[in-house]
Amino acid sequence: MKVGIIGASGYTGGELLRLLVSHPDVRLELATSRSLAGKPVSSTHRHLTGFLDLKYENPVSEEIRERCDVVFVAVPHGTAMNYVPELLDGSTKVIDLSADYRLDTPVFENIYGIKHSDPRKAVYGLVELHPEAAREEFVANPGCFPTGANLAAAPLAAAGLIDIAVFDSKTGISGAGISPTETSHYPNIAENIIPYKLTAHRHRAEILQELTRLDGKLRNISFTPHVIPSIRGILTTAHLFTKEPLSTGDVQEIYEEFYRDKPFVRLPGGVPSLTAVRGSNFCDIGFEADKENNRVVVLSAIDNLVKGASGQAIQNMNLMFGLAETRGLWLPAAAP
């Protein structure tokens, strides 16, 4: 299949290129950047030197549709909605990595403060919870924090066992994007941990949306992120206060059954490690029951650029074209 990437110069675009260049069913057709048109893709993604000879382009949507079977849209929030309508005006399939189509339109407009110009529905592409992504024409790829949080809590939410859910996530600085910020500036983040948006992070809406879909009575959900001096990875600690006491054995049975036949979710035992998932599309989950307080502590570890973004987008692409979801993604982590 012929693949295009709109907004290929950023971290998620670069990760799409890294993973797709060795995908056995993919031909990389184009990579776009308005500011870098004409320059080699490897001039910004030097790790891809010798693996592809693409140059950045800035074609119109009609040309993109004619040249590509599927397009990944990896542009900032509020920008994707300018591309998607024209890209879908034909047979080309689209996977959007921004937040523009993840939420119901009124919720998106309230949280992001942007008037939506194309309020169409898209399948939310967390494959483990939405197998209907298969054979779809348009998928909204989930956010990185919601991926880790929702995979951590989904089995207990689906069982109707959660009373209160509190999520604490630690993320590497690549989650801030390729443009330097105060948080990602080395003197500020080195040997430091920076909490931010303590009660009103916009990804909470995605967590709430997905967990209430599994349990319509669940409303008490809190989320606080922290940036840590690591390049990649998100470690989420979910404090799930349950309606009844559970043993660790009970939790093990629930999670094993829920994630049966879900190849990218692993239950390795013990505490998950960011190094065990770095560069891979896996989500590792561990847990321990606190029966005294009717609490289950669940930990999830993902690579924010892979399972939290580009790898998950390719997982969706595979299903959209009738391929095994592991195609081109069944790779071990780059540890240590």
Curated annotation (Swiss-Prot):
Q: Name one GO cellular component term.
A: cytoplasm
CDD domains noted in UniProt: AGPR_1_C, AGPR_1_N
- Which UniProt keywords are present, listed alphabetically? Amino-acid biosynthesis, Arginine biosynthesis, Cytoplasm, NADP, Oxidoreductase
List GO molecular-function terms, semicolon-separated: N-acetyl-gamma-glutamyl-phosphate reductase activity; NAD binding; NADP+ binding
Q: Sorted alphabetically, which SUPFAM superfamilies does this protein's record hold?
A: Glyceraldehyde-3-phosphate dehydrogenase-like, C-terminal domain, NAD(P)-binding Rossmann-fold domains
Say if the entry is tagged with keyword Zinc-finger: no
Family assignment from sequence similarity: Belongs to the NAGSA dehydrogenase family. Type 1 subfamily.
What does it do?
Catalyzes the NADPH-dependent reduction of N-acetyl-5-glutamyl phosphate to yield N-acetyl-L-glutamate 5-semialdehyde.
Protein name, please?
A: N-acetyl-gamma-glutamyl-phosphate reductase
Classification from the root reads: Archaea, Methanobacteriati, Methanobacteriota, Stenosarchaea group, Methanomicrobia
